[in-house]
Amino acid sequence: MKTIHVIGAGIEGQEGFSRRALEIVEHADILIGRAGQLALFPDFKGETLVIEANLAPVVECLAAAKGAAVVLASGDPLFFGIGRYLLRNLPDAELEFVPNVSSVQYAFAKIREPWDDAVFVSAQGRGMKGTVDQVVAHDKIAILTDAVNTPSAIATELIERGRDGYTAYLCENLG
């Protein structure tokens, strides 16, 4: 049975990968990731595939792959990442995950705040209402945003609901 390694890229570029992760990449026949992640491995000799918004070509490529395949992900692939999509669309026995520090872990470290009591929500590609409902319901929350559901849009929605007095940290471009 083939193994597809899904490796989390860390905050520190190639230096943030474990020795094991780098060895897996070195022996891969195909390397899949976003353009910036692939750029971390300029000397990679195998086939590459750039991940775009549509993930179907990634699954097609992995399903057809005969050699060693690696998917580069951000941080922890199973934390609001590509890992969930791959598990839904490929045999889970073929997938092996090698996580790294997630953007949320890194953000909490930067603001010097324990995060074991936080709630995590992704507003990426989702509606605003559920995200804001979570903010209202919890004392500590980390929100992954996108170009539509921005921190500003979330703050505006909170103010429109008459909710204010929150302490917020905006952490961006974390790696």
Regions found by a protein language model. Give the residues of each.
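Short, well-ordered alpha-helices that flank and scaffold nucleotide-derived cofactor binding pockets
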Residues: R84, R88, A109, T156, ...
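Residue-level "edge-of-site" marker
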Residues: L38, V121, C171
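Short, flexible loop segments at boundaries between secondary-structure elements
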Residues: S103-Q105, A109, L170-G175
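Short, glycine-/small-residue-rich phosphate/pyrophosphate-handling segment
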Residues: F108-A137, D146
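Short, contiguous strand/loop micro-motifs
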Residues: G8-A9, A73, D117-V119, I141-A142
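Class I S-adenosyl-L-methionine
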Residues: M1-Y106, Q124-R126, G130
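A short alpha->loop->secondary-structure connector
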Residues: L90-L95, E113-D117, E160-Y166
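A contiguous loop/helix-start segment that scaffolds small-molecule binding in enzyme catalytic cores
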Residues: K2-V6, R20-L22, A53, G67-A69, ...
